[in-house]
Amino acid sequence: MLQNEVENFTNLLEQATVYLAPYQEKIIVVKYGGNAMINEDLKKLVMQDILLLNQLGVKVVLVHGGGPEISQGVKLLGKEPQFINGLRVTDQDTINVVLQMLAGKVNKSLVALLKGKGVGLCGIDANMLQCEKLQAEVDYGFVGEIVKVNTQLLELALSANLIPVISTVGVDDQGVAYNINADTVASEIAMALGAAKLVSMTDIAGLLRDRFDESTLIPEVEVSEVQGLIDQGIIAGGMIPKIACCTDFINAGGIEANIIDGRVPHAILVSLFGGKNGTLFYKK
């Protein structure tokens, strides 16, 4: 490495250390999904960024979805994926696909990209995600809601400087497996671990005043403003439960939560290093 390259690298490292100081030896939970997971180039960049954070002393927990792969697996069975109010209807065939694709193929492909630092976990392991069947007006099948998060495996992995990579399947007290919403899992795990920050990667720029115009991005929201934004119709549809996960985390003692644009290369680093990406939720 040439002298000027060494100097540039040193300067960058010093700047990164300043921005990361509040998070060193602290836990950040990242919910990973959307286009950043489908696009192979973006996927590699995300894993590289998470590895870098790990090397710089940040304890990262990665919670991932896998919707497209699950839908593809269901179609291979000759069935059409079904959704109601944004939630996947999960019959017996579908939960089998979830276990094979989400907890299997998708999880292990991410672990492989973490080059020996990732450890693949499923919410069924050691009853990490204890859940019960989701009670709703509609019967979603094997869709669960979390009753308790057991953090023992996560704490063991983090203490060994490993990166837990978690697929969002839980189990009830009868040993029945359930599919669980990834944003909910990330928020519940962040609260259970006392994480400093929750990051949710999406396929949109963040919270928009006009959902058809990305120039109307709202960069910051104080949690007390959320209900007013719902009343105005600015927070609507699938953003309501996503933002509820952020506010639940902050109200439980988390420092801040970000909904970031996963289509942007190095989106996680940009948000941590003080750049403009997505919407930051915080409490005064």
From Swiss-Prot:
Pathway: Amino-acid biosynthesis; L-arginine biosynthesis; N(2)-acetyl-L-ornithine from L-glutamate: step 2/4. The keyword Acetylation does not apply. It is an enzyme of class 2 (transferase). It catalyses: N-acetyl-L-glutamate + ATP = N-acetyl-L-glutamyl 5-phosphate + ADP. One of its GO terms (molecular function) is acetylglutamate kinase activity. The keyword Nucleotidyltransferase does not apply. Its EC number is 2.7.2.8. CDD domains: AAK_NAGK-C. One of its GO terms (cellular component) is cytoplasm. The record marks 31, 242 as: Transition state stabilizer. Keywords: Amino-acid biosynthesis, Arginine biosynthesis, ATP-binding, Cytoplasm, Kinase, Nucleotide-binding, Transferase. GO terms for biological process: arginine biosynthetic process via ornithine; L-arginine biosynthetic process. Substrate binds at residues 66-67, 88, 179. It is found in: Cytoplasm. Catalyzes the ATP-dependent phosphorylation of N-acetyl-L-glutamate. Belongs to the acetylglutamate kinase family. ArgB subfamily. PANTHER family: N-ACETYLGLUTAMATE SYNTHASE, N-ACETYLGLUTAMATE SYNTHASE, MITOCHONDRIAL. This is Acetylglutamate kinase. It comes from Actinobacillus pleuropneumoniae serotype 3 (strain JL03).
